[in-house]
Amino acid sequence: MAVLYAGRPVQKCERSRLMFNIDQPDSAPDNEDHDGDVVMHGQGSFFGRRKGHKLRAHQADLIENLLPHLSLQIDSPAPEPLTTLFDPPVEHMRLEIGFGGGEHLIAEALAHPDTGFIGAEPYVNGMAKILARIEAENIRNIRLFAGDASELLAWVPAGSLARIDLIHPDPWPKRRHWKRRFVQDATVAAMARALTPHGEFRFVCDIDGYTAWTLAHLLRAPCFDWLAQRADDWRKPWPNYTMTRYGRKAEREGRRANYLRFERL
């Protein structure tokens, strides 16, 4: 589909190269260290930090006592339909990958009480923060997963998710670490399997290199269509978007996020 860029019609692949320099390598210096320890687990390929600041007493208590009640166990088959994870069953299911402090996930869960949400986050401090919000606001439509989101995608039944959100993921700027980025051909295919027809994958990132990377992977995926029709569609947040703490930090530091929406065909 052609859209307008600088007053002339361009195809989506051409536009993505114009806007995000898809064919150019990332400009981050190779000696830039990533903040945190690198870990792997299970049969997947998760890389990232597991724990940062020491947990406060109440946070530790939530991890020990509340998390087991909300945590998904993927060593047994997923329920079908997936909506029966909740009692009573919800109407739709959504997934947020790497929810950080949980600001966006909490806001979405409160705004859509008839939708069930799965939040995947291996970072213990982020898990403790969202557990505190869940407890304080008595939120009943969130389940949590502390492992590799690619394993979770393989676990859910095909066509069971109405939407997947990936908001300000770790960009892994060094070229030798690009294979650690969540968006890969294999995970794009896994998301396509998990999403219902006309479901959406939404991606927010303030690093143009990773935005370009994501566009390149999604534009070559036959099961997805980029929904942008004009520049503001990726330059501005979608309606009712909840800015995360990391998003506000990026704005303070002068980095503008891009907001991408892809439809599962």
From Swiss-Prot:
Tell me a GO cellular component: tRNA methyltransferase complex
EC id: 2.1.1.33
- Keyword Lyase in record: no
Coiled coil ranges (UniProt) are none
Any idea which UniProt keywords this protein has? Methyltransferase, S-adenosyl-L-methionine, Transferase, tRNA processing
| Record: active site | 170
Domain of life assignment = Bacteria
Q: Known catalysed reaction(s)?
A: guanosine(46) in tRNA + S-adenosyl-L-methionine = N(7)-methylguanosine(46) in tRNA + S-adenosyl-L-homocysteine
**PROSITE patterns noted in UniProt:** SAM_MT_TRMB
InterPro entries in UniProt:
SAM-dependent_MTases_sf (IPR029063), tRNA_(Gua-N-7)_MeTrfase_Trmb (IPR003358), tRNA_methyltr_TrmB_bact (IPR055361)
Give GO terms: molecular function aspect only: tRNA (guanine(46)-N7)-methyltransferase activity
Per UniProt, the enzyme's principal EC class comes to transferase
Q: Which Pfam families match?
A: Methyltransf_4
Classification via Gene3D superfamilies: Vaccinia Virus protein VP39
Q: Which HAMAP family match?
A: tRNA_methyltr_TrmB (MF_01057)
* PANTHER family associated with the record: 3-DEOXY-D-MANNO-OCTULOSONIC-ACID TRANSFERASE/TRNA GUANINE-N 7 - -METHYLTRANSFERASE (PTHR23417), PENTACOTRIPEPTIDE-REPEAT REGION OF PRORP DOMAIN-CONTAINING PROTEIN (PTHR23417:SF14)
- Function recorded in the entry: Catalyzes the formation of N(7)-methylguanine at position 46 (m7G46) in tRNA.
Which protein, by its recorded name, is this? tRNA (guanine-N(7)-)-methyltransferase
Q: Which species is this record about?
A: Rhodopseudomonas palustris (strain ATCC BAA-98 / CGA009)
Which classification does the entry list for the species? Bacteria, Pseudomonadati, Pseudomonadota, Alphaproteobacteria, Hyphomicrobiales
This protein's encoding gene: trmB
